[in-house]
């Protein structure tokens, strides 16, 4: 699926799971606008999902934003700028206030996102799946997904129940490398050399 968000429990009274769909990268100008990185595809889809919630902190190994609490924020302006996006947030009217938001994750309620289609997956649904080689070897669990220029990468970390404790980077190539996914069984099957 196009949106690459990671799940995180809603805090502060929100009833829905929040999905990380972007991040504030920097400031734009002197009137409080912020540069935004969107994990959605196309990037401008980020504008559709309101309200936003902001949370300071990097993603932890489980894919959830680890530090801080979610705070709702209203988007009052949004537009493409160069190769990216910029947004104006309610109550943020100068460069200093905008700078205080840099590095914060943008979360939206999961129920705002469209259902994934047949054979499509949100990254948040893949985190935690057990990864099995086509010959049955257990390679570990999906800890995160990484977007690269050529193709996305599944990061698999071995544990005490797997072949070894190595971390593997497996290209997201459905049908070629990723041969099957069963969310119901919590498994992903891959045709990938375990030595890599």
Curated annotation (Swiss-Prot):
Cell compartments where the protein resides = Cytoplasm
Disulphide connectivity of cysteines: none
Any Pfam family: RimM
Give start and end of each PRC barrel domain: 118-196
Which InterPro entries does the record associate with it? PRC-brl_dom, PRC_barrel-like_sf, RimM, RimM_N, RimM_N_sf, Transl_B-barrel_sf
Task: Output the Gene Ontology cellular-component terms.
Answer: cytoplasm; ribosome
User: What is said about the domains?
Assistant: The PRC barrel domain binds ribosomal protein uS19.
Please report which protein family the annotation says this sequence is part of: Belongs to the RimM family.
Oligomer status and interactors? Binds ribosomal protein uS19.
State the protein's name.
Ribosome maturation factor RimM
Which gene is the coding source of this polypeptide chain?
rimM
